[in-house]
Structures are given as C-alpha cells and as structure tokens.
Amino acid sequence: MDAAVKRKLISSDGKTVEVEDSCFKLSKVLTNLVNDFPEPEKELPINDVTEDTLKKIITYLEHYKDPEVKPKDIPKPLPGPDLKLVLDDWDFNYITPLSLQECVDLINGANYLDIPELVTLVSARLASEMLNCEVEEARAKFGIESDMTQEEMDEYDKYPLD
C-alpha cells in the first residue's frame, strides 16, 4: 500500500471519510478491502460504523501507521482502575475522554473492522469502569436492566455468598 494513496470510506450514515491507506495495517478488514479493490477511486463502504466512530478509529490507525510505533501491551486482568499505570500517554489521552457510549460504539467498530489492538484498548477502558463496582452500580453505569424479577432477587438475597 502506497503511503500517498487516499481512500474514501463511506460510513453507515452515508458520510465520506478520507484516509491514507497506509493507515490500514492494523485492520484486517480494511487491508482486505484495499486488496480486493485496489483502485484508489473506489469508495469503500463501512456499513456498520458511523462517521463519528469511523473518525475515532482513523485517529487511532493514523497514530499507529508507522511500523516503529506499536500499541503497548495491556495486562490482563487490569491491576486496578487507574489506566494511567498501564497505558502510554497517547493511548490514555485518546481513550479516557470518551463517554461510555462512545466506547461501546468504538469497540463495536473496532471489532467490525478487525482491529484487535483497539478492541483491547477499549476493553481495558470499559473494564476500568467496572472494577470495584457493585452489580447495581455497574448496571446503572452501563444501562443494563436485570432479567430477574423482584421475587427472584429477594430469594437470591436470602443466600449470600459470604
């Protein structure tokens, strides 16, 4: 892939985002699309990713397009909720300002485009949000409703695990 070749990606909301195809090395899907459609004027549809999310993904890919710059390994499990301890400065400044909904959209987009390093980064951010949370706090934070009835929850509470 030639560094000077610009590609037009069409987001799921019909917006065009231009990017150099030299940025695609971390994405198996984008690399395959360029190989399948080598003509630079060919618009590449990205059906499951909105423009806003696609721009965030491209920012990540542009940062890591240089072979000398590699994403830092993130320990699993996280040692604690402070991402500053496990991320380099760029990744920290990239991921921490995002809302939880933006993170969910980003992890879905990164998964769709097969960018495992970005999936790992966003997963670490989401995991850091859940560390030390009680179940109800995590449900509230992520908008998850319980599938248990009140009666089932009351029955469950009769038998604590402690």
Regions found by a protein language model. Give the residues of each.
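Short leucine-rich amphipathic alpha-helices used at interfaces
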Residues: 1-2, 139
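Canonical BTB/POZ domain core
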Residues: 2-116
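Alpha-helical protein-protein interaction/assembly modules
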Residues: 7-10, 95-103, 107, 116-162
